[in-house]
């Protein structure tokens, strides 16, 4: 029952290991390797995260710098077009449009200095628009934004226009225009130099004009003269209505947004004296339609309100090669939809369409709204861009 005592000379029994000795012993190698590996991975991950963060900052700064370059390029492009453009013939209003404004007599209109010369070698009449002074103030601020439209009757379509001079009643133009006309035909022509006040949001008011029968001019030597402005006769023409829309271009995203806002005084197309108008918006490139959008139909109205936005992808290097065309049509449930009028904007369009486009480019990311007079559908087709 009791263990036998050890006999002399026999080996002593083994004693159990002491746990305190194990805790004080050496750590196994695999544990150290695991700890070192984990620490290394942690340090590597931290360094990698910091590296990626710095790379993102650099890329962000680079893209921001590129965006600034795009914005500056587009702004300069827009400014280069602004001074080259003037309103279309259809937008000129010979009568003052300010409320309560009376027709000014010739003593209040101002006067114009011009020059005439004929180049017998090239068969060209050279008309110089030098300056004007004492022009009538047609703006609310007591000033005007004058420019001069020059043409030879009976041809009203072949016009030249000076630049618009902002907020002045004494503009200095200093511009010369050439009309290729055989000398034997000049006697039957009448030179018209009409001074207008430019208005972005309405029709342009006629300040006055000078008419010079060419039969009364001796072109054997250059002529320079001052003439008092006369009241311009009102030209009757079919009114198709006006449309207001805004343009917004974001160069960094290559995004063009057209917002069709409203139209007014549209031509009556239905038997009942109204119309069911809607607007088609086309993006053209090289004279060909590449994208098409359209608004909703507004029933029984000549003054529709839309406020509908349409976006097109236009890369920055293509913005000079595209045009936007807006056509107002009358919806007909039973027959063919009939076009009321059309307007186009772009660098190859000219007139108010070019001015609106140039203002959009000069103010990237900002919507630029403007009223446009509708033109007959067969006369508003944009010119293909080069």
UniProtKB/Swiss-Prot annotation:
Membrane topology: Single-pass membrane protein
Binding site for Ca(2+) 1: 139, 145, 197-199
Cofactor note: Binds 3 Ca(2+) ions per subunit. The ions are bound to the C2 domains.
Domain of life: Eukaryota
Residue ranges occupied by any C2 domain in the UniProt entry: 108-227, 239-372
Pfam families: C2
Record-listed Ca(2+) 2 binding positions: 138-139, 197, 199, 205
Residue intervals on the Cytoplasmic side: 46-386
SMART domains named in the record: C2 (SM00239)
Subcellular location as annotated: Cytoplasmic vesicle, Secretory vesicle, Synaptic vesicle membrane; Recycling endosome membrane
Gene3D superfamilies reported in the protein's UniProt record: C2 domain (2.60.40.150)
Molecular functions (GO terms): calcium ion binding; calcium ion sensor activity; calcium-dependent phospholipid binding; clathrin binding; phosphatidylinositol-4,5-bisphosphate binding; phosphatidylserine binding; protein heterodimerization activity; SNARE binding
Positions with biased composition (Pro residues): 1-16
Name of the protein in question: Synaptotagmin-5
Native organism: Rattus norvegicus (Rat)
